[in-house]
Amino acid sequence: MPVVKGGVWTNIEDEVLRAAVSKYGLNQWARVSSLLARKTPKQCKARWVEWLDPGIRKVEWSREEDEKLLHLAKLMPTQWRTIAPIVGRTATQCLERYQKLLDEAEARENDELGLGGPGTEASAPSADDVRRLRPGELDPDPESKPARPDTIDLDEDEKEMLSEARARLANTQGKKAKRKARERQLEESRRLAVLQKRRELKNAGINIKIVTRKPGEMDYNADIPFEKPAAPGFYDTTEEEARNERQREMFDPRKQQLANKRKGDQDEEAERKKRKNDKNSNSAAFAAAARAGQMQKIREAEQSSKRRALVLPTPQVSESEMEDIIKMGMAGDKASKMVGDEEGTKGLLGNYSAMVGGTPIRTPRAPPEEDHIANEIRNIRALTETQSSLLGGENTPLHDGGSSTGFDGIAPRRQQIVTPNPMATPFRQGNAVSATPVPGGAGPGATPLRTPRDHFSLNKEISGGLPIGSTPREIKMRENLARQSIRGRLAALPKPKETEWELEQLPSESAEPAGATEYPEEDSAVRDAREKEIRKRAAEAEHKRQTQVYQRSLPRPVVLDIDALMERASRVMDPITGLIAKEAALLVANDACKFATPGAKIEGKPRKLERLDDKYLEEARAAIASEASSGKLEEWSNEFDAKWSSSRQDTLPGLSNYLDDDEEDAYQQEQRIIGVFDNVQASLLATAEDGNKLEKKLALHYGGYQNRAKMLRAKITEAHTALEKSKHELDAFRTLQISEEAAISRRLEKLREEVAFVMRREREAQEQYRCRKDELDDLVASTGGMVNGWH
């Protein structure tokens, strides 16, 4: 009959599971479950994860944990396996706590609405009653429940399981233990052999990787089991160090030893009395159970959370404000002392330092805070009970904003705790009640708040001395009341007398517009396009203001001496031509400096170029165009071509340079040829010098690269030579391998023949020996044991 495994866990099974986990670890659940006859590997693992793991927190849930649980349930609905490690609990604990919070909220709402009924007999069953198991039902999740106490009389199966577990867990000298020890020694020798082999291969230049971890298992030599890495970041340990120092100073080793001794004596005395009273019971079992109980208490004490530090709200009255209040009080006292006994001035000063002693001062009530947990539960219930979105209608109203945990991140939104500051708005606390209201505001009221005394009734009170409300609705009502009061007082003024007044007629003024026209906000894309168009037009206008040389991208001077250029322009005698030359020199210098070409050498300080208006530039261009359209341009062009041709014919080397004999004598021709030769020679020398300079410059810049190229070329040659040598060696060794393989077969055949010959001779010798032995035995038998007369 198959055995159905599962059910409630007992205390014995828990202890066996703990011992098995301590021996086999957290990765061999099949071996662990072999010690428990009624549990499967999955159930053993679930029991450890859900209940027996020392890292599980079983203390009461705090308010922060409830708030975080509801916030994460809102962000990740039904993902309890993901929520559990964030909250610090198990998935089952999170689910049960979540359901309990919803049930408590529902019960609270029913009590508020009066749905509880007249008595418990008429009320509906609670959530705990619904979830409580009825007789005959099985717990669907027994791994997360406390263990059942052990019975006095154990079943035969339980006794057999317990004895087998004791034998297997306590066996360290039996056959299996010895076999395990031999296996460990073999494994160690195998590991050392692998290390030796790896060391030899490494010395030979071959690196291999040792993989000792089996697939699906943990390498306990390389990894750390049960490791819980700390969160990254730096933490301030000043407070912890100070607390440790205080505890170390308060610790007295003598008192501690005395207390431990007394405690040990008391425990031993109680244990002795217990053993004496219970003689029939198994003392060893009770001692083990007692030790297990003590260890459980120690573990629970370690799991309990530390006492949290006191978190005080930030004060609203800062040090500077406190100093200002003190200075104000000192200034009032100083003014009172300066007045002295003058009654006229003394009546204008009030004493604001003295407080009314007979009135008890209450602590101002802090503003009410939103209950995030209750709001989140209401939101969850509203979303659960809402109708389908297919039916239409309005959305479910939820608590958003500051009244909920929000969706800012994985952690819920925190409320900023502040203390009320009555000094910030004196006499205007909407949540305060006057202890001794004075009707009509005739004098200062003795309020429980720390408000200054109002001797001159500057702060008027409303409704019998109650402080003025600070809500928007009350402020609006107060303003409307003040307006009505002013209108009533103005209406109560006497009517004006009937008197005619003659006023001078004032000049008419243009009517002001009734209100400023509101323009719609301009789109950012339209604004960017408009600004881009404006910048483009400004750039085009600036481009047109430049010279034609820059506009047409004509070459500009590379080597220029501005001072020499300006001096040459100033030497022109004709005033009109001089002005033109100066302006041209300024334009050339400005273009050379402002739009310099790469590698240009400009000497001298550039002169400031006067910026002309666009109107004048257009007029000048129109005048030049009109002048160019006339016949003078053609005449000037012809004259320029003629002079250019004549100048080029006289300077260019060629046949055109040499005139006829009747026009020029031989001496002048010789001198011209000599001059041309000198010019060509000078040009060649200059070109050679420039080439040498350029060669030096290139050698300076690229000398390192050339050396590097030479070195790499040499290395490549060496590598090629080594490669060729290696190829030759490889071919030689391959030839040797082929010849060796052929020779090996021949040698093996020869050795086999020799072995066969030796074996054949050995068989023949054995056969001959056997024959001789038989002959000797027959001879001895025939002679009766006498050979040569001897027995």
From Swiss-Prot:
Key words of the record: Coiled coil, Cytoplasm, DNA-binding, mRNA processing, mRNA splicing, Nucleus, Repeat, Spliceosome
GO molecular function: DNA binding
Subcellular location: Cytoplasm; Nucleus
Ranges of Low complexity composition bias in the record: 280-292
Gene3D superfamilies: Homeodomain-like
SMART domains per UniProt: SANT
Residues annotated as domain HTH myb-type: 1-56, 57-106
Main location: cytoplasm
Source domain of life: Eukaryota
InterPro entries recorded: CDC5L/Cef1, Cdc5p/Cef1_C, Homeodomain-like_sf, Myb_dom, SANT/Myb, SANT_CDC5L_II
Coiled-coil ranges (or none): 523-551, 705-779
PROSITE patterns: HTH_MYB (PS51294)
Start-end of Basic and acidic residues biased regions: 128-151, 240-255
Region listing for Disordered, in residue ranges: 110-188, 225-318, 390-471, 494-526
Keyword Transferase: no
Classification via SUPFAM superfamilies: Homeodomain-like
GO biological process terms held by the UniProt record: mRNA cis splicing, via spliceosome; mRNA splicing, via spliceosome
Portion annotated as DNA-binding: 29-52, 80-102
GO cellular component: cytosol; nucleolar peripheral inclusion body; post-mRNA release spliceosomal complex; Prp19 complex; spliceosomal complex
Family (UniProt): Belongs to the CEF1 family.
Function noted in UniProt: Involved in pre-mRNA splicing and cell cycle control.
Subunit architecture: Associated with the spliceosome.
Name listed for the protein in its UniProt record: Pre-mRNA-splicing factor cef1
Gene: cef1
